[in-house]
Regions:
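Juxtamembrane regions of bacterial inner-membrane/periplasmic proteins
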Residues: 2-227
Length: 227
């Protein structure tokens, strides 16, 4: 029978082990490309359950081989303060809280850093445990990665359509070109899908999508180039 002291010791070593593995994982991904994420595997499982053929359309490309407008577009669309915050946009969080209090439609306050932490290290569940781990990994990547690296991993790992992950894959499948050849308008259209890339498509954009694309193109004028 385990004593309280034994249980405490086991929990202590589990915590130390988790800390060591998580820090090591973040350090490894500081240099190593992210080829597979938990979400990719989950989507494959969902395809099998639904009787569909599982597939992962993904091709890693370094940031310098992407259109210079792609980081600008997602900053304008997803995280206007990406270059200045340290992982959490507290102004956006306060605004979202006020909107919820007034009964307005909930706006997203998740930063690119938070989304990257979730995409690479966690599952898309909405539990408090996952949210806590997301905050933890966000702090780690902000401490151990550069902003350029966070953006590079984000643009290579994020879901951009059914079975499509990363900017190179969506460029090839939806625009018939490489990520480096995407135009300013292409990048704005891709960014417009990111709140829900399974609902909004850059291949067959709706009227709403075209309107959102124009808004993002306008906002891009106020975002500096990342490289």
């Amino acid at each position: 029978m385990f004593t309280f002291k034994t249980i405490t010791k086991i929990l202590k070593w589990l915590a130390v082990g988790f800390l060591a593995i998580s820090v090591l994982s973040v350090l490894v991904y500081r240099w190593v490309p992210v080829y597979v994420t938990p979400l990719m595997l989950i989507r494959c499982g969902e395809s099998i359950i639904n009787g569909k053929t599982p597939a992962i359309h993904h091709r890693w490309v370094p940031l310098e081989e992407m259109s210079k407008y792609m980081p600008v577009a997602v900053i304008a669309s997803e995280d206007a303060n990406f270059l200045s915050h340290h992982g959490f946009d507290f102004d956006a969080i306060r605004s979202a809280a006020k909107d919820m209090k007034k009964g307005k439609r909930r706006r997203g306050a998740s930063t690119i850093s938070q989304q990257t932490a979730k995409n690479v290290f966690l599952t898309p569940s909405s539990t408090w445990l996952r949210k806590g781990l997301e905050a933890y990994f966000t702090v780690l990547i902000e401490l151990l990665w550069s902003k350029e690296r966070i953006m590079e991993v984000y643009l290579n790992s994020i879901e951009m359509g059914p079975q499509i992950y990363g900017v190179e894959a969506v460029a090839i499948r939806h625009f018939g070109c490489q990520a480096s050849e995407l135009t300013r308008a292409n990048c704005a259209l891709i960014a417009a899908t990111l709140p829900n890339p399974l609902k909004f498509s850059s291949l067959k954009p709706s009227r709403y999508m075209r309107k959102r694309q124009k808004q993002i193109e306008h906002e891009m004028r106020f975002v500096p180039l990342l490289r």
